[in-house]
């Protein structure tokens, strides 16, 4: 058995997270029409699949979850369908009888969402009613009947009806009817990338092929945050991979309850408002979502068991983009050796990611700390963490190092994305392609030194990658001064904000999180911790979510605060203003472990109705409420 066959046999042949019989069909085209009702807080719709049968099957099985299905038609004729009982987390299979002989067919289904829909959230926006969807990983089935697996990709035509402006996962098309919006997506996409948003949306340009959308009050801030870098990001990404194929790269800044940092919706990337920090320190999230235009959207993991193929590649490309931007800016500033500086910036970002990986491995379910997961009976949302992002990045960085660096790895990047574009693949196909590419170049022996078993299937951390620490060392020097001070037992504090004056955004984050990590092994007095806001007032006053979350972790973890202290009250109230799970889930865990479980639950109960259904469910699990 070859190593590729062995890797292939170690994961499921078919996606275990879908009830559909997707392997028996090719989806030629999908037409999806959605109608928004703000009064009823639901979305009704119609989906038409143009299918080609790959077997003699006499039934079509689609995924649904908490959907009302009213009619089903096959080749224009109404048929009797069966909606099987709901079983969490995979929903209710929709079984539609079809002719076993005809190779080509169209299937049409009418449906409506219910109040149990996990994909959509109706809220009151800043200027009026608002609805948005979030279908990753397996929530598209609660929006419309579908093959809810990344293993199926289809071109789409979308129609949306709403009294408010709509965006969907495609390029806007002309409409002659008020309240009706048309979109075309000629590039095949999977169900989790289907999206609808409707609200009082306005747009502003942030580049020659990019607009940003948001509600009016925040539009100018959104425009300022992204306009400096957007087109540069696209052009650099095109040099690393190849030409951007999606025509336009527009983005939408969503309300605060959006549960992720960003979501790579084709032609309309969704972004959390926590990115609007008014200092451009978080634009790397935009670089990440842009990178998804190749990794994830053009080339897709075939199931959520191979999620690292989406996210590991995306983080890798994101850091290449960020490094190249830094090098270009260094050259403009007349710095010596700008290319070297750009590489130092890339490595510095990798160090931040490595720290997140270490923290995740220490606190997460071990079975989900491998790159390839077994999701036969599990909800992919339960497996979601920094693992596929950061361990995936480190795997690709390890390969890059083994084959001789970026100059040797860059041709493979272009080859890989050209070979698999418009397709979905698994980890075995990736490894096989890697060997096919490098063996003729005399690098098979180098690849053979990579422990594929350990990287792909074993839980835990990989070996320390030994990143360039040049930019991190400035931070570590200050941290060591703090460690020495605590160990000395001195009481006169000699630190001030001047210590961090020269730090840039990412360095500040590294400083706070490294201090938090080092303090766990020291006897740090709560009195000293409570002095920190007066020593570093810029952190105490920061509106940047990355700084704010880390700063409050440092204070609450070691400050011996109670639920009646203003610091804890402030942080608890902040958790009610953000919906991004990156902040919300660790935030409640912090309250649980460092204040009290009762206070954590009480705070969650106060804000739970503000959170997106995905976020609400995950916090309930974290606090043992579900």
Curated annotation (Swiss-Prot):
Alphabetized GO MF terms: aminopeptidase activity; epoxide hydrolase activity; metallopeptidase activity; zinc ion binding
Subcellular location: Cytoplasm; Nucleus
Cofactor note: Binds 1 zinc ion per subunit.
EC number(s) from the headed UniProt entry: 3.4.11.-, 3.3.2.10
Pfam families: Leuk-A4-hydro_C (PF09127), Peptidase_M1 (PF01433), Peptidase_M1_N (PF17900)
Keyword Lipid biosynthesis attributed: no
Positions contributing to Zn(2+) binding: 288, 292, 311
One of the GO BP terms on file: peptide catabolic process
Top-rank lineage group of the source organism: Eukaryota
Cofactors (names): Zn(2+)
Keywords in alphabetical order: Cytoplasm, Hydrolase, Metal-binding, Metalloprotease, Nucleus, Protease, Zinc
Reaction catalysis annotation: an epoxide + H2O = an ethanediol
Cysteine-cysteine disulfides: none
Residue positions of the active site: 289 (proton acceptor), 389 (proton donor)
GO CC terms, sorted: cytosol; nucleus
Sequence positions that bind substrate: 134-136, 259-264
SMART domains in UniProt: Leuk-A4-hydro_C
Protein family per UniProt: Belongs to the peptidase M1 family.
Its biological purpose: Aminopeptidase that preferentially cleaves di- and tripeptides. Also has low epoxide hydrolase activity (in vitro). Can hydrolyze the epoxide leukotriene LTA(4) but it forms preferentially 5,6-dihydroxy-7,9,11,14-eicosatetraenoic acid rather than the cytokine leukotriene B(4) as the product compared to the homologous mammalian enzyme (in vitro).
NCBIfam families the record matches: leuko_A4_hydro (TIGR02411)
Protein name according to UniProt: Leucine aminopeptidase 2-1
Organism: Scheffersomyces stipitis (strain ATCC 58785 / CBS 6054 / NBRC 10063 / NRRL Y-11545)
UniProt gene name: LKA4
